[in-house]
Amino acid sequence: MPREFSRSDRVSAQMQREIAEFLRTGIDAPELGMVTVSDVDVSRDLAVAKVFVTFLGARLETRAAVKRLGEFAPQLRQVLGRRMRMRIIPEIRFAYDDSLERGLHMDEVLRSLNKDGDL
């Protein structure tokens, strides 16, 4: 019977849980506000993990907040190395997840079209 999820999918899910826990308890960076890990995309060869995050109440501009978060990547890899059963922990790259903003923009466009009677 084939597996339902690939290894990279399982690693992504576990990394998402572990990274969220680390960001909640393992860093002291109040300027980032509340950081939410929305997704982790791990490459097929498990060499790179792209961590998508959102910020609530951040005092920094988005790019600066992502850069600041990247400063914690080496420490995070060490923590993941202790918590996960993997020979090699993927390189961690943070990226801002703008899907919520894009969704809100699409909603505004649809509402304006509907209001104008174009829909």
Swiss-Prot record:
PROSITE patterns: RBFA. Keywords: Cytoplasm, Ribosome biogenesis. Monomer. Binds 30S ribosomal subunits, but not 50S ribosomal subunits or 70S ribosomes. This is Ribosome-binding factor A. It comes from the Bacteria. The lineage of its organism: Bacteria, Pseudomonadati, Pseudomonadota, Gammaproteobacteria, Methylococcales. One of several proteins that assist in the late maturation steps of the functional core of the 30S ribosomal subunit. Associates with free 30S ribosomal subunits (but not with 30S subunits that are part of 70S ribosomes or polysomes). Required for efficient processing of 16S rRNA. May interact with the 5'-terminal helix region of 16S rRNA. GO terms for biological process: maturation of SSU-rRNA. Belongs to the RbfA family. Its main location: cytoplasm. One of its GO terms (molecular function) is ribosomal small subunit binding. It is found in: Cytoplasm.
